[in-house]
């Protein structure tokens, strides 16, 4: 994943509506390094790879396992790959989510294109008989083996990388979203709004655990952490006259 956030001086800009782009983020001089694409690496606007890619991966795991919120989260990482650049978010991070009956481990390393299981990104469901590796580009099954008469024999049949057939899933989702908006009918959505919201919330929890440096615990009845410092990071501080509407 690209990460070219070298130090860049502030400049004047006349092309963009910069104030509107900033929105509720703190007012500061325009700097091209904090604009598109690199805004992802600055806390004022985003949450680094934990949230940028977390919502594209975590939703698959949460949907498959039928869960929404973890019992606890802890994270460790830092700026290890690019310690001297201007970015603020961790380029390297491991986050452990504890759910009932299983843990989910998130791991990212900016600048390293090769990943586990021969893929650049994805979710691995690790079971007793095999590992299912899946992302938006397809899936594969890697079997565990067992000793049978001195030979290592696969417990289940291996499934090589298989791509989904038919039209692009991204195109189908985009069309479905637009049609649902035009009909003003969220029930038409193939991927419900809640699916996206819980993925975003879990991703933000990872960053909150990283910022506190603690293992934080979630109270599902109150929709709050049990830690005061963690709760202070749930809501952003709005600037420039922007306010979060109260519903």
Name these PLM-found stretches.
Residues 1-247:
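Contiguous beta-strand/loop segments that form the cofactor/metal-binding neighborhood of enzyme cores
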């Amino acid at each position: 994943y690209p990460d070219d956030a070298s130090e860049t001086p502030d400049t004047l800009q006349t092309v963009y509506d910069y104030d509107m782009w900033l929105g509720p983020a703190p007012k500061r001089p325009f700097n091209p390094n904090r604009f598109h694409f690199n805004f992802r690496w600055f806390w004022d606007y985003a949450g680094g790879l934990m949230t940028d890619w977390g919502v594209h991966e975590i939703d698959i795991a949460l949907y498959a396992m039928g869960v929404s919120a973890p019992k606890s989260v802890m994270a460790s990482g830092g700026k290890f790959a690019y310690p001297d650049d201007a970015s603020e978010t961790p380029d390297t991070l491991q986050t452990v989510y504890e759910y009932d009956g299983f843990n989910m481990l998130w791991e990212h390393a900016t600048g390293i294109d090769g990943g586990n299981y021969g893929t650049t990104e994805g979710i691995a469901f690790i079971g007793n008989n095999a590992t299912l590796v899946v992302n938006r580009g397809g899936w594969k099954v890697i079997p565990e083996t067992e000793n049978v008469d001195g030979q290592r024999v696969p417990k289940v049949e291996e499934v090589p990388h298989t791509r989904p057939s038919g039209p692009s899933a991204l195109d189908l989702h985009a069309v479905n979203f637009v049609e649902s908006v035009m009909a003003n009918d969220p029930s038409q959505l193939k991927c419900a709004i809640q699916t996206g919201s819980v993925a975003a919330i879990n991703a933000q929890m990872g960053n909150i655990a990283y910022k506190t440096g603690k293992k934080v615990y979630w109270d599902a009845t109150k929709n709050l952490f049990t830690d005061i410092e963690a709760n202070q990071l749930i809501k952003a501080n709005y600037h420039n006259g922007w306010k979060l509407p109260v519903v």
